[in-house]
């Protein structure tokens, strides 16, 4: 398995989860775990996604998600799991 961590943050509105998961499905990525919450009007989501069988390469998926974030008004970050864990260790 090759996992990435995807974080999504922005003002809450309908369709954010649907749009992000649509891009992942179109690229044959598999959601391993997902957590999402709304804090007042702030949408936050973190996903663990297996990209070992994606139909594109990592950089193409990253660009597609960044473009989607711009289109729907949220910030989407994609990091390999080991980098995410290293950056957020205590």
From Swiss-Prot:
SUPFAM superfamilies: ACT-like
Domain of life from the UniProt record: Archaea
Residue ranges occupied by any ACT domain in the UniProt entry: 5-79
HAMAP family linked to this entry: UPF0237 (MF_01054)
CDD domains: ACT_1ZPV
PROSITE patterns linked: ACT
InterPro entries in alphabetical order: ACT-like_dom_sf, ACT_dom, UPF0237/GcvR_regulator, UPF0237_ACT
Protein's name in the database: UPF0237 protein MMP0657
Family the entry assigns: Belongs to the UPF0237 family.
